């Protein structure tokens, strides 16, 4: 089920404060560490660099593409590592 049209996009207050501070100081190259994977990428985040926590590490996310706006930060930092499907077990045993 999608989000209602009348609701504004969600952005955690701490993330909003960090983005506003980075834009005010002009520190575009500084990496902003965030834990809020549910926050939506807004147009004022364009050109900033984030480090999104996936539960273990901080994954670097650079918001440099116009197509990223409207997506959530969690979409760009995977939480699971794909190890691959089973292959030839005889070859791995040698």
UniProtKB/Swiss-Prot annotation:
Keywords in alphabetical order: Ribonucleoprotein, Ribosomal protein, RNA-binding, rRNA-binding
Cited Pfam families: Ribosomal_S19
InterPro entries: Ribosomal_uS19, Ribosomal_uS19_bac-type, Ribosomal_uS19_SF
Matches recorded under SUPFAM superfamilies: Ribosomal protein S19
GO biological process, one term: translation
Listed GO CC annotations: cytoplasm; small ribosomal subunit
GO molecular function: rRNA binding; structural constituent of ribosome
UniProt KW Hydrolase keyword: no
Domain of life from the UniProt record: Bacteria
NCBIfam families: rpsS_bact
HAMAP family, sorted: Ribosomal_uS19 (MF_00531)
Role played: Protein S19 forms a complex with S13 that binds strongly to the 16S ribosomal RNA.
UniProt family annotation: Belongs to the universal ribosomal protein uS19 family.
This protein's name: Small ribosomal subunit protein uS19
């Amino acid at each position: 089920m999608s989000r209602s049209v009348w609701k504004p996009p969600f952005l955690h207050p701490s993330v909003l404060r960090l983005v506003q501070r980075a834009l005010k100081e002009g520190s575009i190259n500084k990496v902003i560490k965030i834990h809020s994977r549910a926050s939506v990428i807004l147009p004022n985040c364009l050109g900033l660099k984030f480090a999104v926590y996936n539960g273990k590490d901080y994954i670097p996310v650079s918001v440099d593409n116009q197509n990223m706006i409207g997506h959530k930060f969690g979409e760009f930092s995977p939480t699971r590592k794909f190890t691959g499907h089973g292959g030839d077990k005889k070859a791995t045993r040698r």
